[in-house]
Amino acid sequence: MTEAYDHSPDEVESREELDYHLAKGSLAGLTIQGLALDRDPPDLSTVDVSNTLFVACRITDPELVADLTRRGAIVVPDLHNRLYPTHPSRLYAPEDLAAGHRNGFEGLYDTRVYRHFVAHGGALADIREALAQRLHDHGIDDALNDTIDAWTAASGGPVIGVMGGHAEPRGSRAYRHAAEIGRRLAVAGCLVVTGGGPGVMEAANLGAAASTAQPEHLTTLIDQLAAAPRFDDGDAYTRKALEVRELLPPEGAADAVAWARHGGLSVPTWLYGHEPANLFAARIAKYFSNAIREDTILRLARGGLVFAAGRAGTVQEVFQAATKAFYATDGASGPFVFLDTEFWTGTLPVEKLLRPLLADSPYGDLAKLVHVTDDVDEAVELLRHGAPATARDTQRTTP
């Protein structure tokens, strides 16, 4: 059965899986992703390839491409001269984004892709670059769905989003609170997802990454990170993160669940690539499109959301999430937990707007979703027990 390979039976993403189908004599209707078919080339001359989609596979023989096309296949090549894959078949790992760190912040793979992004027009790229970026983001979508489907099938736990200010310094009270929430949620079997930036987002992934260690180990890690508290100095900030990563519990054998307790998920964007990469998530779904990225985070986090203090970006996420809850766009929502009473009732009193808004939802009075607290224990309990029964079925990036 194809399920022996992964949770996407119509997609072939390894040579072993390809060989399995070749032995059956048919690739008809399948999608073959990201395989190096120029290495020990498989014999495709007699296999059925009608309606087979080859995406970003390395095929160096033009006659083979022509033959596959004549026989009913569609071949979408990996676009050349890009620093990034135009159809990634898996999510990024911290090691991918940090590659080249010996040459400083500017040498990081993550930074080099960001410089490429800016040099080619950023969010307003020319048609060729825009196409390459869209193909890349589609590949991330697909890899993320595979990852979440596998995790949900094996775990069944809810996905919880943690939002908040990117400028929150390492070692601050809010940073420590977010890290502790991330740790406790991971221990409770939840998947922590963040926007993949620094500040509160880094803290939550760090907490999840330390969730298999003793609680006091997290304090030690934060104390060490606090030696490089702000991301203005990308070199020092990244160097300290890499040092602390060496002190994290090892992930061990890869499976569909364990990674959630070794950092969880982050969903960053190269639109904000001037900020150092958050290197504490175990799986990283990095997009070029910030609009897709924002929607993806909120679509996944059906189990609930934590909003630590933040400014414009966080407030945008608050009301985008509220809109989704109001119209049940992605199904029922878990609780909205606002951490820092003074900030959310005084500085930016969103509670006064959200409660009457959500009370008038066509799906009933949803004002009860809104909670404001300073208590980490209360926040975690609300999230652990507040996920809707439908969360398991709706925490996907696509229907």
Language-model regions, residue ranges each:
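Active-site donor-nucleotide binding/catalytic segment of nucleotide-sugar enzymes
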Residues: A154-E168, L185
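Short glycine/serine/threonine-rich phosphate/pyrophosphate-binding segments
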Residues: G171, V200-A204, G313-Q320
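Glycine-rich phosphate/diphosphate-binding loop of Rossmann-like nucleotide-binding domains
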Residues: S172, R183-A188
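Structural motif
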Residues: G195-G196
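Short, acidic/small-residue loops that bind anionic groups at enzyme active sites
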Residues: E216-Q224, S266, A308-A309, V315, ...
